[in-house]
Amino acid sequence: MRIELKAIGLVRTNAQKLPRHWSVSDVEGTLVIDEEYLEGLRDIEAGQRIVVIFHFHRSPAFSPEMLLQTSGQSGKEMGVFSICSPVRPNPIGISVLEVLGTRGANIDVRRLDMLDGTPILDIKPHIEEMPG
């Protein structure tokens, strides 16, 4: 099965060093969304958390020998699906970001763990617990 995804925008940040995970990040930047998706940004507000799905565009091509990798956190060899490595069969990442504000098709955020130029695939609201 072939699946095609289209970027809806990209990340802009001046940060040179990034933490390995959004949960320990104070890095700020901007999600620059393509104008054709502007209407879809309605109701995103400062103080809200959003889930950003992105493409690890600088990761090397995946091969079977990468199924086991050394965890950056524990130093142990672990299965790729049990760690947060950017080297994956499908180079897709997920981060929960704090919205600082919006300006047209730009969303200013904090907690970035993405490089400048990272393609954004989707944005969803962060919902702690579904009502009902």
Where are these regions (language model features)?
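Glycine-rich, low-complexity intrinsically disordered segments
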Residues: 1-132
